[in-house]
Amino acid sequence: MAHKKAGGSSRNGRDSESKRLGVKKFGGESVIAGNIIVRQRGTRWHPGDNVGIGKDHTLFALSEGKVSFQRKAGNRSYVSVIPMVEAAE
């Protein structure tokens, strides 16, 4: 008669891969059109001027400029891209 129960495999031991979410370009940083500014789940940050939103709520630059974060009415946070004034030649 066995005195020890058969050792079963652990029921834990699995984990999902990290999704690398968060702010990729911070306030004041320069961006070009297409640069990803924020990767997020849901709309923690909303798109402002010159910023587009992807189907997974990723915010990206629509034009060249500097990133700006601001909080507006309703306590919502918005991300905008302020176009750089090009020097007249």
Swiss-Prot record:
Transmembrane segments: none annotated. Residues 1-22 are annotated as: Disordered. Gene3D superfamilies: 2.40.50.100. InterPro entries: Ribosomal_bL27, Ribosomal_bL27_CS. GO terms for biological process: translation. The keyword RNA-binding does not apply. It comes from the Bacteria. Keywords: Ribonucleoprotein, Ribosomal protein. It holds the Pfam family Ribosomal_L27. GO terms for molecular function: structural constituent of ribosome. PANTHER family: LARGE RIBOSOMAL SUBUNIT PROTEIN BL27M, RIBOSOMAL PROTEIN L27. Belongs to the bacterial ribosomal protein bL27 family. This is Large ribosomal subunit protein bL27. It comes from Bartonella tribocorum (strain CIP 105476 / IBS 506).
